[in-house]
Structure formats: C-alpha cells, structure tokens
Amino acid sequence: MRYIATRLNGDGTETPLSFDVPLQGVRTTDDLSGPGGLEGSISPEVQRLQTAGGEPIFHAWSTALYAEVDGKLRGGAILAGLKAQGPSLSLDCVGFTGYLKDEPYTADYSRVAVDPLDVARHLWEHRQAKTNGNIGLTVDTTTSPIRIGTPVKETSFTTGAGEDVNFESGPYTLAWWKTRDLGKEFDDLATSTPFDYRVSHEWDGETIRHRLILGYPNLGARREDLRFVLGENLFQRPTIDLTGGDYASEVLVLGAGEGRKMVRSVQSTPTRRLHRTAVLEDKSLQSKAAADRAALLELRSRLGEVDITEVDVTNHPHARIGEYSPGDEILIQTRHDWAGEVSLWVRILSITLDPQTERSVLSVTRVERV
C-alpha cells in the first residue's frame, strides 16, 4: 500500500511528485453519481515533501493524490483544501467530477432532440477546453434513447384525472448568462434521464488514466457471487430502519408551470397500511414523463419497508476489496432483535475505504428504493 502525489498540469497530463506520501488517517470515498474524495493528514512536518525548487508539493487545485493497494488504484482525488494545525497538515481532496462544481458555462448552446448523455459529454468538453482546465478525464461514449429539447411551442394535455396542463417547451439551452454551475447541470441531467456515473483511475504503464464511466439507465450488477454476512465479513450488526416515519402510499409531484398549468403526476400503490400522501415540488420537471419518473422513485423510497443504510465490512473471500463497486447489488444477511433474521438485497451507493486496515463503510439501500 502506498499514497502517490502528482501535479495536474492542466493540459491532460500529470507529473509524479512523490510515490511515498506519508499520509495518516486516510479515507477514500467512491460514490455512485457523486464526486467522492480522499482525506488524510501528515504529522509531523515532513521536510522532503518539496519540489526540487524547495516548494511544498501540496497546492490546492494542482496536486492530485491516489491510494494504491496491491498495485491497484483504490481512490484518486484533487486537493481542494489544506489546513495547517501546528506540525499537522490536513488534506481535503475532492473526486475528479467535483471539478465541475460552481464552474460557469461561458458560451451559448441550444439543441433540439439531443441525447442527455451527449450534453453531459459537452459539459466536460467545454470545461476541459479551458486553458489549464484539462484534467485528463476521458468520458464514456455511452448513449441513451432519451431526447431533450423541442422546438418552441405551447404544450397542452389533459391528465388522467381530467385536469388541463399547459406550459411552454423549447430547446435545451446552456448560456453564459444563466448557467453558473456545470456540476449541478451535470447532476440534473443524471437525475432526469436517468443515468449513473462514477470515475475510475487505472495504471497504463507509468501513466494514470482517468475515465468517467456512464451507465444508462444505471451502473452495476446483481452480484450473486458475493455476500455480506454478520459474523463473517460484517464487523458489527447493521442498524435496521424500522420507523417508517416518511411512509406514504401515494406521491403527488408538482413540476414546471403555475396553477392549473403545472406539470403534475400522482403515483400510488396498495398497502396494508393507512393511505398517506407525500407532496414533492420540483420546477425542473418539464414533462409528464419526467414527473412520473420522479413520483415513482419517491414512492419506492416511502413504502416504510425494513431498510439498511450502512454496513461496516472487512476484506474477506466472500467480498474482497475491488470485487464490488458502487451500483452493485449485494445480499446482506444479519439478525436484529426486533426484525429477527434479515436477508436483504441492497444497492451500494458509496464506499469509504480505510486502506490501512482494509475496512470499508458502505452506504447502501434496499434495491426496491432505487
């Protein structure tokens, strides 16, 4: 195991700075459809962590750090902040997709019937075309059958409940005067299409390659070959959510438009509980189809079923580090005093790894909720 520091040169290349950074308390986070990151500290001060010119190798938005375990890169991120406290230096690094956050669009873009994944690639092309803006991230060529953007027109329809809906639709646009956060634009596309994404870092000879993996409609697979079992590779009994505090058997989604012209969707399912309705407002939902998708997703998350949201696992033959990734579905087998024996398929949303101890904390949710 080792920690590596490089300098991102801004032209798509990077220069090695150190192959043995003495980091302590390291945690790497690999998110599904999120930036992830890396955090750690150095204490006491290490004089050798300098360039040939005597300058510190750690510079925010210039230095990249990687965790390598058994020759495989298990995490990589860009240094976004550092704080000195006496002899200790704390490092806070954001995953590569975090590079889009708060960055504005500086041109004009308008498309009709465009694949959202093409727009997602365009956002990265626009960002990495800037002087010193190329971080060497290659974006997948994945496509989808979804199309966004229409000729300008007044859209009218009647819902199944007999209500009239009217709103104006038009091209999908990006503009210097309104698009101020490319990261939010990218995530909005991922949610509405939908598609998943995550970043991988791999050795290619002596060069580190960065790839933004896109998956329509999602990434991951059901892993029948792996399992998490209490007493085998689960360190402690997972907390099981039994409350059902946000339970609803019906969801009302209100989207773009005002009053009777508002985009609307109602989705419900029969249950053995009392009828309850949850209301979700999201003005970014421009179509009935988008509102339907949002309502169904919200409904699945509110059915009040037994759920597990976090597990603490160790490296084990039943599920070794690197064998599973965010997006994968894995069976959890545990026991709870109130719920009894629990066997639950969950989807991995995030993996936070301690490379030193080879322990991981996984954020998960039952597969029916995503």
Question: What positions do the PLM features span?
Answer:
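Charged- and aromatic-enriched interaction segments used to assemble
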Residues: 94-243
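Acidic, small/polar-enriched beta strand-loop surface segments
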Residues: 2-6, 11, 184, 214-356
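Short, well-ordered strand-loop elements centered on a beta-strand within folded domains, enriched
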Residues: 89-95, 205-217, 260-264, 358-367
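Short linear motifs in intrinsically disordered
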Residues: 45-60, 201, 238-243, 318-323
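Short intrinsically disordered coil segments
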Residues: 55-60, 106-112, 228-234, 268-270, ...
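Beta-strand-rich assembly/attachment modules of structural machines
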Residues: 1-125
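Oligomerization/assembly interface segments of phage tail-like spikes and tubes
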Residues: 28-49, 87-98, 189, 253, ...
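Short beta-strand and beta-hairpin "edge-sheet" elements
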Residues: 64-94, 331-363
